[in-house]
Structure formats: C-alpha cells, structure tokens
C-alpha cells in the first residue's frame, strides 16, 4: 500500500478517488494534485510507479492536511469559545451556529431527548 501524508491509500481505486481518503483533500483538490503531478486521474494506485507516488506526496505536502488541519480547526473552535462570542457560546452549548431553528429540530446537534421528571 502506498502511504501519502501518513495515510494508507487504497490501491484498488482510481488516483482521484484514493486521494480523497486523506483528510483535507476533496475531489476538486485531488484533481488539481493529479494534474500538477502529471498523473492520470483514472490510473489506479497499484499501477503507479514510485516516482509518480513521490510526485503525489510532494504535491500533497504543499497543503495543510490530516493532523495539522484537524489541529487548526480545533484551535479555531477553541479560540471562538475563549472569546465568548456568539459562535463560541453556541459551540460550548452544542447548539447549531448558523441561525437554524432549535425549538423542534436540531436533534443531531443537541443529542437524544432528555426526559422531564414529574
């Protein structure tokens, strides 16, 4: 298996699809990485030689992916919570951030219903 950015890339998939296994690489970014590395999008990972995989590694290394990206996102959320701004308060209370209604919906964000004692 090829390892790119610390992730085992599935070998039986096309290059574009396999690159999306990396956190921070979506389909559009995967297409641009393949184009910059000079690798055909329909080539399967198992058919690539070591030089092509190295080119893909170099292109992926130009972006913030995996652990660094996760850390960056969590630090941004923590910063909002420390500031005490509206979005930070909503994060702290595990409520929707972007103005959705919460009287009847938002079950995914709020979690299961809590029974009221009589």
Curated annotation (Swiss-Prot):
Keywords: Ribonucleoprotein, Ribosomal protein, RNA-binding, rRNA-binding, tRNA-binding. PROSITE patterns: RIBOSOMAL_S13_1, RIBOSOMAL_S13_2. It comes from the Bacteria. One of its GO terms (cellular component) is small ribosomal subunit. GO terms for biological process: translation. Residues 94-118 are annotated as: Disordered. Located at the top of the head of the 30S subunit, it contacts several helices of the 16S rRNA. In the 70S ribosome it contacts the 23S rRNA (bridge B1a) and protein L5 of the 50S subunit (bridge B1b), connecting the 2 subunits; these bridges are implicated in subunit movement. Contacts the tRNAs in the A and P-sites. Part of the 30S ribosomal subunit. Forms a loose heterodimer with protein S19. Forms two bridges to the 50S subunit in the 70S ribosome. Belongs to the universal ribosomal protein uS13 family. This is Small ribosomal subunit protein uS13. It comes from Pseudoalteromonas atlantica (strain T6c / ATCC BAA-1087).
